[in-house]
UniProtKB/Swiss-Prot annotation:
<dbReference type="InterPro" id="IPR036343">
    <property type="entry name" value="GluRdtase_N_sf"/>
</dbReference>
<protein>
    <recommendedName>
        <fullName>Glutamyl-tRNA reductase</fullName>
        <ecNumber>1.2.1.70</ecNumber>
    </recommendedName>
</protein>
<dbReference type="InterPro" id="IPR000343">
    <property type="entry name" value="4pyrrol_synth_GluRdtase"/>
</dbReference>
<dbReference type="GO" id="GO:0019353">
    <property type="term" value="P:protoporphyrinogen IX biosynthetic process from glutamate"/>
</dbReference>
<dbReference type="InterPro" id="IPR036453">
    <property type="entry name" value="GluRdtase_dimer_dom_sf"/>
</dbReference>
<feature type="binding site">
    <location>
        <begin position="112"/>
        <end position="114"/>
    </location>
    <ligand>
        <name>substrate</name>
    </ligand>
</feature>
<keyword id="KW-0521">NADP</keyword>
<dbReference type="Pfam" id="PF01488">
    <property type="entry name" value="Shikimate_DH"/>
</dbReference>
<dbReference type="InterPro" id="IPR018214">
    <property type="entry name" value="GluRdtase_CS"/>
</dbReference>
<dbReference type="InterPro" id="IPR015896">
    <property type="entry name" value="4pyrrol_synth_GluRdtase_dimer"/>
</dbReference>
<dbReference type="Pfam" id="PF05201">
    <property type="entry name" value="GlutR_N"/>
</dbReference>
<dbReference type="Pfam" id="PF00745">
    <property type="entry name" value="GlutR_dimer"/>
</dbReference>
<feature type="binding site">
    <location>
        <begin position="49"/>
        <end position="52"/>
    </location>
    <ligand>
        <name>substrate</name>
    </ligand>
</feature>
<feature type="binding site">
    <location>
        <begin position="187"/>
        <end position="192"/>
    </location>
    <ligand>
        <name>NADP(+)</name>
    </ligand>
</feature>
<dbReference type="InterPro" id="IPR036291">
    <property type="entry name" value="NAD(P)-bd_dom_sf"/>
</dbReference>
<comment type="function">
    <text>Catalyzes the NADPH-dependent reduction of glutamyl-tRNA(Glu) to glutamate 1-semialdehyde (GSA).</text>
</comment>
<feature type="binding site">
    <location>
        <position position="107"/>
    </location>
    <ligand>
        <name>substrate</name>
    </ligand>
</feature>
């Protein structure tokens, strides 16, 4: 059986191609059945996210060309374009790749946790489609096991590697818990949207989004149960904010020293944590001079992020070692399964030969043939039948002077070797 991991991802293919060959959840069952029918895949899993589409499959004589052709035809894409932007791994390399993906080592953001859930869902879809057997059941359970171990035993996911998440983590570090904090976000771009989601996950007491265009602020706030403000309403509400995070495209500061100073006075100098993620700055640098204002800029956070990336890269080396060990364990199990299959086939073949000869003997007895003669004939035929294949193998090894195979056959058949001392 050939095990293959084939696909495209953010490192090998542009977003236009990734979009073209992505699978929706509704199409997954149809896709898996089509893959099995048209390529002969015995077992398969398809992982499809915004950053990758990968096919993990096992079959006799499965090739990258067959998978490329199938994927192109299923999505009406160009096979040559797919071929130029794809990659393929075989056997143990494929196993390691699957485990790396599930552990987040192959992700756009090193160590991101979402991919594990996506791989698990892909596996569930494959099971529901009836294309999972014992090999892939074992492979993916070991994959999930090593991913869990990587999460619990390394620092792969414990440090922020985006300024949005870093700002939330820094606020959490300062306030210990954010559940009693009022948060004001200024802006409505992608960064603020990410910050809003992270803050919502932390269970903040109150979340407000202020923006020049109220409709855009509402698009972020409404799904999270947050309130919205216009920029002109900020002065009246700033005193209520324990945490302020700003990221707009404004060419002039949104918050000046005087405005923040008045807000702190109204707060009776209760500390305020401010993060300026904008370039040019949204918050005047002089705000940092105020006793009860703790101002951080995008440069401060970038230093934290870079340090955290280094930490994750170190953790990734630890994770890779765990993957090597788990992949080796799976390969040993797989090899053991192959020997079990051979033994099962040998036993079935022997039992079939026995049953055939017994049936003939019983027929002879029913016809009145002498029992002693039937038993002797049965014994001779059974002996000849069982030693036929080993005899051929021994003769072949002897003729080819293949001492290694000769020794293996002698050991397997319990025969004393020619140079062994008699006992």
């Amino acid at each position: 059986m050939t095990l293959i991991a084939f696909g495209i991802n953010h490192k090998t293919a542009p977003v236009e191609l990734r979009e073209k060959v992505a699978f929706s959840p509704d199409a997954m069952v149809e896709a898996l059945k089509s893959l099995a029918h048209l390529t002969g895949a015995d077992e398969s899993v398809i992982v499809s996210t915004c950053n990758r589409t990968e096919i993990y499959a096992q079959a006799e004589n499965l090739t990258a060309d067959a998978l490329t052709t199938w994927l192109a035809e299923f999505h009406q894409a160009k096979a040559d374009e797919l071929g130029l932007n794809s990659y393929i791994y075989h056997q143990e390399d494929a196993i390691k790749h699957i485990m790396r993906v599930a552990c987040g080592l192959d992700s756009l953001i090193l160590g991101e946790p979402q991919i594990l859930g996506q791989v698990k869902q892909a596996f569930v879809s494959a099971k529901d489609s009836g294309v999972i057997k014992s090999d892939f059941e074992r492979l993916f359970q070991q994959t999930f096991s090593v991913a869990k171990r990587v999460r619990s035993e390394t620092e792969i996911g414990s440090n922020a590697v985006s300024v949005a998440y870093a700002s939330v983590q820094l606020a959490k570090h300062i306030f210990s818990s954010l559940k009693k904090s009022n948060v004001l976000l200024i802006g409505a771009g992608e960064t603020i949207e990410l910050v809003a989601k992270h803050m919502h996950e932390q269970g903040v007491k109150k979340l407000s989004v202020a923006n020049r265009t109220l409709a855009r602020a509402e698009a972020i706030a409404q799904p999270l149960g947050a309130t919205t403000l216009t920029l002109t309403q900020i002065p009246a509400h700033l005193k209520d904010a324990d945490i302020v995070i700003s990221s707009t495209a404004s060419q002039l500061p949104i918050l000046g020293k005087g405005l923040v100073e008045r807000a702190l006075k109204d707060r009776r100098h209760k500390p305020m944590f401010l993060v300026d993620l904008a370039v040019p700055r949204d918050i005047e640098a002089e705000v940092g001079e105020l006793d009860d204002a703790y101002l951080y800029t995008v440069d401060d956070l970038q230093q934290i992020v870079e340090k955290n990336i280094e930490s994750r890269q170190h953790a990734a080396l630890q994770a890779q070692q765990m993957i090597e060990e788990q992949a080796q364990q799976y390969m040993l199990w797989r090899q053991g399964q192959s020997s079990i299959d051979v033994l099962r086939d040998f036993r079935q073949q022997s039992e079939s030969q026995r049953d055939t000869l017994i049936a003939k003997a019983l027929n002879q007895l029913a016809d009145g043939k002498e029992a002693e003669q039937v038993i002797k004939e049965l014994a001779n035929k059974l002996t000849n039948s069982l030693i036929h294949a080993p005899t051929k193998a021994l003769k072949k090894a002897a003729m080819q002077q293949d001492n290694k195979n000769m020794s293996l056959l002698q050991d397997a058949l319990g025969l004393a070797r020619a140079n062994d001392s008699s006992k």
